[in-house]
């Protein structure tokens, strides 16, 4: 099962390591560590993407800040229990990590494919700049009865199309993983 390719959740990205490795957790004696990857957008701005890596893929005691890597893996989520509420934590789970000399234009810089099911009715809205977007929450199944719950944003005509999706509907999504800063607001509470 360890080498089974999970086809419904695939991420490929390349970027520069931007942080040291910090311990996350251990499973059956295997340590997992978090780092951050700076990944360029087409606009040349950069996203800081959290990446989880096994100690079996890389020597986590070394300093690799500034090194370029190519990563293939999955998009994962889990609920972090905080004082009065849960917080959905999103990261890329690296199944393969390869050091590269510099950015290689033949490698997808930031590509994601998800095959899952709609969890909540999509929310269609317009941004303050008038752009149409739809918020979609997708459940992507993985082995052993687990699922990753991944919030997605559809833009433009795709937003109008996605706004009609029904809960339980099967959806295939291709896109990128941009860094998202989510700010909580007081909604009349």
Regions found by a protein language model. Name each.
Residues 1-189:
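Single-stranded nucleic acid-binding surfaces, predominantly the OB-fold ssDNA-binding core
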């Amino acid at each position: 099962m360890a080498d089974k390719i999970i086809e419904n959740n695939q991420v490929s990205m390349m970027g520069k390591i931007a942080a040291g490795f910090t311990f996350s957790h251990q499973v059956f004696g295997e340590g997992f560590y978090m780092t951050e990857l700076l990944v360029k957008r087409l606009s040349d701005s950069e996203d800081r993407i959290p990446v989880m890596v096994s100690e079996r893929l890389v020597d986590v005691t070394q300093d690799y800040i500034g090194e370029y890597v190519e990563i293939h893996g999955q998009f994962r989520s889990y609920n972090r229990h905080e004082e009065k509420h849960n917080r959905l934590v999103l990261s890329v789970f690296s199944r393969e990590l390869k050091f590269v000399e510099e950015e290689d234009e033949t490698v997808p810089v930031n590509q994601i494919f998800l095959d899952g099911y709609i969890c909540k009715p999509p929310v269609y809205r317009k941004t303050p700049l008038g752009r149409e977007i739809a918020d979609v929450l997708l459940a992507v199944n993985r082995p052993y009865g687990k699922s990753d719950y991944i919030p997605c944003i559809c833009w433009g005509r795709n937003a109008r199309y996605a706004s009609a999706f029904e809960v339980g509907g099967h959806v295939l999504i291709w896109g990128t993983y941009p860094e998202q800063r989510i700010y909580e607001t007081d909604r009349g509470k």
